[in-house]
């Protein structure tokens, strides 16, 4: 049996925080605001995986009202989600992700992001695709106010 999941997330850019996307720290004058490390891409991947196994979303599993998850490492959260996927008997077929950001340019960081996601999902890097786009200076991402991400995952029953 195949299961498809979709994830979407948005975080506001703010000064005084590191910019971590896809488990990769990107040099930039702003970072993403959030209760955890605010890794918009890994949150999207986690939500897609949870959706595919009908387990809600990351807000249900890691509520921002719980101090345990303050400044949490999203890579570890994704590993926890992947353990749930495996418990339900699924394995990764592939995942396709898109980052929407006007700045900074993501191209130099795409391959390391793919590698981190593959590591968390215990998959081959060829099963992971990450791409980035601008929004042609339109909307909150185009104005540099935040970064958005979406992902679609395909899982297969072992």
UniProtKB/Swiss-Prot annotation:
> Could you tell me the keywords of this UniProt record?
Isoprene biosynthesis, Lyase, Metal-binding
Q: Which InterPro entries match?
A: MECDP_synthase, MECDP_synthase_CS, MECDP_synthase_sf
> Which Pfam families does this one have?
YgbB
Q: Name one GO biological process term.
A: isopentenyl diphosphate biosynthetic process, methylerythritol 4-phosphate pathway
- Chain positions recorded as a divalent metal cation binding sites: 9, 11, 43
Cross-referenced SUPFAM superfamilies: IpsF-like (SSF69765)
As to how many cofactors bind and how, the note says:
Binds 1 divalent metal cation per subunit.
Q: What is its EC number?
A: 4.6.1.12
- Pathway where it operates: Isoprenoid biosynthesis; isopentenyl diphosphate biosynthesis via DXP pathway; isopentenyl diphosphate from 1-deoxy-D-xylulose 5-phosphate: step 4/6
Known catalytic reactions: 4-CDP-2-C-methyl-D-erythritol 2-phosphate = 2-C-methyl-D-erythritol 2,4-cyclic diphosphate + CMP
CDD domains reported for this sequence = MECDP_synthase
- In this chain, 4-CDP-2-C-methyl-D-erythritol 2-phosphate is annotated as bound at 9-11, 35-36, 57-59, 62-66, 101-107, 133-136, 140, 143
Q: Identify which cofactors the protein needs according to its UniProt entry.
A: a divalent metal cation
Site (Transition state stabilizer): give the residues.
35, 134
Quaternary structure, from the entry: Homotrimer.
HAMAP family annotated for this entry? IspF (MF_00107)
Recorded family membership: Belongs to the IspF family.
NCBIfam families of this UniProt entry? ispF
Specify the protein name. Answer: 2-C-methyl-D-erythritol 2,4-cyclodiphosphate synthase
> What organism is this sequence from?
Bacillus pumilus (strain SAFR-032)
């Amino acid at each position: 049996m195949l299961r498809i999941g979709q994830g979407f997330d948005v975080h506001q850019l703010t000064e005084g925080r590191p910019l971590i996307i896809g488990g990769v720290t990107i040099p930039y004058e702003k970072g993403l605001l959030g209760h955890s490390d605010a890794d918009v891409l890994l949150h999207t991947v986690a939500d897609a995986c949870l959706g595919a196994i009908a387990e809600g979303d990351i807000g249900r599993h890691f509520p921002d009202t719980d101090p345990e998850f303050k400044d949490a490492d999203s890579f570890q959260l994704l590993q926890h989600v992947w353990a749930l996927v495996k418990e339900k008997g699924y394995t990764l077929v592939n995942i396709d992700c898109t980052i929407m950001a006007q700045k900074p340019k993501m191209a130099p960081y795409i391959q390391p992001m793919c590698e981190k996601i593959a590591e968390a999902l215990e998959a081959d890097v060829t099963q992971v695709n990450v791409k980035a786009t601008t929004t042609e200076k339109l909307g909150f991402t185009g104005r540099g106010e935040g970064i958005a991400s979406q992902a679609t995952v395909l899982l297969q029953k072992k």
